[in-house]
From Swiss-Prot:
GO CC annotation, single: cytosol
Task of the protein: Could be a nuclease involved in processing of the 5'-end of pre-16S rRNA.
Biological processes annotated in GO: rRNA 5'-end processing
Record-listed E.C. numbers: 3.1.-.-
Protein source organism: Helicobacter pylori (strain P12)
Protein name: Putative pre-16S rRNA nuclease
UniProt-listed HAMAP family: Nuclease_YqgF (MF_00651)
Upper classification of the organism: Bacteria, Pseudomonadati, Campylobacterota, Epsilonproteobacteria, Campylobacterales
GO molecular function: nuclease activity
């Protein structure tokens, strides 16, 4: 199975590829780096993930890239790790919340649903860029 994550300072959005369908999973709420990396490690083990797709912004966001790479090194995972450009994935995910009212959009942003929808965009990009070549 393939899992994607959108690593943020407060939440980690999670999405999985199940039978060819990209689905958002419950986001990991991040209290600190070690707790979040343990939670992600546990999820990867529980779901028997073979490939972890990680969203990274373009090179102009050097600090963010370093932070994401450092966090991923803390994750206990022996499978394949693939980094995919995440530029605008959060904006695209937010556009998917158009049907919600302002209050519910704010809630979706706070509870991690938006982050997991962003992880869905990252996983879709992986499928388009990597899986189509196989």
């Amino acid at each position: 199975m393939i899992l994607a994550c959108d690593v943020g300072l407060k939440r980690i959005g999670i999405a999985a590829l199940l039978n060819g369908v990209v689905l958002p999973l419950e986001a990991i709420l991040r209290h600190n780096r070690n707790q979040a990396s343990r939670d992600l490690s546990d999820l990867l083990r529980e779901k028997n993930i073979q490939v972890l797709v990680v969203g990274k912004p373009n090179e102009s966001y050097a600090d963010t890239n370093v932070r994401i790479e450092h966090f991923i090194k803390l994750v206990d995972f022996t499978g394949e790790i693939v980094f995919i450009n995440e530029d605008n994935s959060s904006i695209e995910a937010y556009d998917n919340l158009e049907h919600l009212g302002r209050k519910n959009k704010r809630l979706a942003t706070k509870d991690g649903r938006l982050d997991s929808l962003s992880a869905c965009r990252i996983l879709e990009r992986y499928c388009q860029q990597v899986l189509k070549n196989h």
